[in-house]
From Swiss-Prot:
Gene: rlmE
Source species of the chain: Idiomarina loihiensis (strain ATCC BAA-735 / DSM 15497 / L2-TR)
Protein keywords: Cytoplasm, Methyltransferase, rRNA processing, S-adenosyl-L-methionine, Transferase
GO CC annotation, single: cytoplasm
NCBIfam families, per database record: PRK11188.1
Protein name (record): Ribosomal RNA large subunit methyltransferase E
Job description of the protein: Specifically methylates the uridine in position 2552 of 23S rRNA at the 2'-O position of the ribose in the fully assembled 50S ribosomal subunit.
């Protein structure tokens, strides 16, 4: 007999399959419901424009890369990275690996080829342990790495959209993002679950 699911996992499964955005993604043949978060950000903030170079961190299963590729329709470059495998997407150059490792980071930077990126996207999140303090520290480490990637690859005037979990370290990170970009907004997309602490920082006009 299989292991009995916990009350919390049963609740998550019910929420997941009752979720209108999960159902909408399935009907449209999309890779994940996360695409609707980026779609809403794009409608409000106009981050992505044809002809740009976009880096997608934490890309698997590919919802955001798929959205950008469809938007570009061949006019633009997308470089994606994730520790998990991702089915190929036309127009997306995908690197599988953990970019916290030096060799993977070097390979990713080589593909990017210098400070010529218009937009860095990050929907990264750690594997949750259930320990809130540990999970928050891990998630803040990932967003700090994403900001460091901006410093290495973004053009002046470039943009950054990053998922952040509110909690310890959030205000300090927000201050760092504001120091690097002239305009920073906090977004809570409609498709983000209400009880989730996740928000998205949308930063434009990179100045460093």
């Amino acid at each position: 007999m299989g292991k009995k699911r916990s009350v919390s996992s049963q609740r998550w499964l019910k929420e997941h399959f009752d979720d209108q955005f999960v159902q909408k993604a399935q009907k449209k043949g999309l890779r994940s419901r996360a695409v609707f978060k980026l779609e809403e950000i794009q409608k409000r903030d106009k981050l992505i424009k044809k002809g740009q170079t976009v880096v997608d961190l934490g890309a698997a299963p590919g919802g955001w890369s798929q959205y950008v590729a469809d938007y570009f329709n061949g006019d633009g470059q997308i470089i994606a990275c994730d520790i998990l495998a991702m089915d190929p997407i036309a127009g997306v150059d995908f690197l599988q690996g953990d970019f916290r490792e030096e060799s993977v980071l070097e390979a990713l930077l080589e593909r990017i080829g210098g400070k010529n990126v218009d937009v860095v996207l990050s929907d990264m999140a750690p594997n949750m342990s259930g320990n809130g303090t540990v999970d928050q520290a891990r998630s803040m480490y990932l967003v700090e790495l994403a900001l460091d990637m901006c410093h290495q690859v973004l053009k002046p005037g470039g943009s950054f959209a990053v998922k952040v979990f509110q909690g310890q370290g959030f205000e300090s990170f927000l201050k760092d993002v504001r120091a690097a970009f002239n305009d920073v907004k906090t977004r809570k997309p409609e498709s983000s679950r209400a009880r989730s602490r996740e928000v998205y920082l949308v930063a434009t006009d990179y100045k460093l």
